[in-house]
From Swiss-Prot:
Cell wall formation. ATP binds at residues 125-131. PANTHER family: UDP-N-ACETYLMURAMATE--L-ALANINE LIGASE, UDP-N-ACETYLMURAMATE--L-ALANINE LIGASE-RELATED. Belongs to the MurCDEF family. This is UDP-N-acetylmuramate--L-alanine ligase. Keywords: ATP-binding, Cell cycle, Cell division, Cell shape, Cell wall biogenesis/degradation, Cytoplasm, Ligase, Nucleotide-binding, Peptidoglycan synthesis. Its EC number is 6.3.2.8. The keyword Metal-binding does not apply. Pathway: Cell wall biogenesis; peptidoglycan biosynthesis. Its main location: cytoplasm. It is found in: Cytoplasm. One of its GO terms (biological process) is peptidoglycan biosynthetic process. It catalyses: UDP-N-acetyl-alpha-D-muramate + L-alanine + ATP = UDP-N-acetyl-alpha-D-muramoyl-L-alanine + ADP + phosphate + H(+).
Length: 483
């Protein structure tokens, strides 16, 4: 009897027309993860990006052909072209594909195709998607369920942000930034929270954003499941409109899975989760922050619905090795002035930055908190300006890099100079580092014994922290600009 391949098992027969799939912007975390899964399923993968990265190197090892730079010739063999929302319609590869009548689909459409014949678990929300997705994937793996997962960050235990499993479970982030999560039709949907972000997608209307989340839940079958954080005011307000089975989680006494008794010691936290039947689990998570304990509570709710054993859940949380750029601990360094701890975090929304600051304060209360922050997008800085000023005022020393534009045009009054002025009006003394090449020397001037340096943001600051770590945080090397 012929053995069915993963490709035959989880795709429509009509997908036989597709042999070569080209990704424009293949180095992105979400794009690269999907490309990696499709490569494993036997498709020929090509792609382009502006530079080599760890992601493109991994894809090349998986058999993908990666072009550096965008050119119309890159798509000449493609049967379908996949693009992310970050790619402009004027990209020569998109123009060439359309001229050749080659289908051009968004990243989420291809993810939806991967999910079509699998048991999909989609995690949406303004914050916490990557961590929650990673925790669910880790629990399922610990329970022996061997899931496929596609995550927007590097899962340290897997050494990758994507993996093809042998079961029919597919665990993936659902992208609300461009509303493309509406393409997905999962069996389980998680909403971690809903706050104003990416408002240009929703015409500046929170009501339109709410309607879109309702539509996302309506993509579940009537026998599916929505797992919703009841602590999120907007998300909980929408529950009566969902019309699907709902499980809630959070700190509220009304939650179906209630998180309580939170405590943190350095890089780990402990908490208890109790369901409506009075059954409790006391878990230790190898990750700091109450926000991460809440993410873990969501993962527990999903796992319990799948009847995963408590010991597998607790083991997965305790062994969790973290995710790249989510409170990533680079180490504690000894330099000419004493001890310096270096941590990097991806958070770029005021609520995310606040949660990271809280985790740092609770885990290391005796340390002075020095933040190097890179704002991400002018529109976000404009829309959430006062919230940014409020949260950035909470650190002991702030070094503010210029806004990472992500392709946007500058907006007057929504830049780092303006943020510095507003912070000075609050009695703070931020330092504006207009040239990132000067960051090392400016940081050297600021450092004291027992500092916790937190690099924060979604732009290229994730590369800068690696070069800072490479100096061992030596004052002499930092002053010499050896980054």
């Amino acid at each position: 009897m012929k053995q069915t391949s993963i490709r035959e098992q989880y795709t429509r027969p009509a997908m036989r027309r597709i042999e070569t799939i080209h990704f424009v912007g293949i180095g992105g975390a979400g794009m690269g993860g999907i490309a990696e899964v499709l490569a494993f399923e036997g498709y020929r993968i090509t792609g382009s990006d502006i530079a080599h990265s760890a992601m493109t190197d991994r894809l090349i090892k998986a058999g993908a052909e990666v072009f550096i730079g965008h050119h119309e010739n890159n798509v000449k063999d493609a049967n379908v072209v996949v693009v992310s929302s970050a790619i402009d319609e004027t990209n020569p590869e998109i123009i060439a594909a359309k001229a050749a009548r080659v289908p051009v689909v968004r990243r989420a459409e291809m993810l939806a195709e991967l999910m079509r014949f699998r048991h999909g678990i989609a995690i949406a929300g303004t914050h916490g998607k990557t961590t929650t997705t990673s925790l669910i994937a880790s629990i399922y793996a610990q329970a022996g369920l061997d899931p496929t997962f596609i995550i927007g960050g590097l899962l340290n235990s897997a050494g990758s942000n994507a993996k093809v499993g042998k079961s029919d479970f597919l665990i993936a982030e659902a992208d609300e930034s461009d509303a493309s999560f509406l393409h997905l039709q999962p069996m389980v949907s998680v909403i971690t929270n809903i706050e104003e972000d990416h408002m240009e997608t929703y015409g500046g209307s929170l009501e339109k954003m709410k309607d879109t989340y309702v539509d996302f839940i309506h993509n579940l079958p009537f026998y599916g499941l929505a797992v919703v954080c009841i602590d999120s005011e907007v998300a909980s307000e929408l529950i009566p409109r969902f019309g699907r089975p709902v499980i809630t989680y959070g700190e509220s006494s009304d939650a179906d899975y209630r998180m309580s008794d939170f405590s943190q010691s350095a890089n780990t936290c402990k908490f208890t989760v109790t369901n409506k039947q009075g059954e409790s689990l006391t878990a230790t998570l190898n990750m700091p922050g109450k926000h991460n304990a809440l993410n873990a509570t969501a993962a527990i709710a999903v796992a319990k619905d799948q009847n995963i054993a408590n010991f597998a859940i607790l083991e997965a949380l305790q062994k969790f090795e973290g995710i790249g750029r989510r409170f990533q601990h680079y180490g504690e360094f000894e330099n000419e002035r004493g001890s310096v701890m270096l941590v990097d975090d991806y958070g770029h929304h005021p609520s995310e930055v606040a949660a990271t600051i809280t985790a740092a304060r609770e885990g290391w209360p005796d340390k002075r908190l020095v933040m190097v922050y890179q704002p991400h997008r002018f529109t976000r800085t404009r829309d959430l300006y006062e919230d940014f000023v409020k949260v950035l005022a909470e650190v002991d020393q702030l070094l503010l890099l210029d806004v990472y534009s992500a392709g946007e045009e500058p907006i007057v009054g929504a830049d780092s100079k303006s943020l510095c002025r507003s912070l000075r009006q609050r009695g703070k003394e931020p330092r504006h580092v207009a040239n990132s090449a000067e960051l090392a020397s400016v940081l050297a001037d600021c450092l004291q014994n027992n500092d916790l340096v937190l690099t924060q943001g979604a732009g290229n600051i994730g590369q800068l922290v690696k070069t800072l770590a490479a100096t061992g945080m030596s004052i002499e090397k930092l002053k010499q600009g050896e980054v």
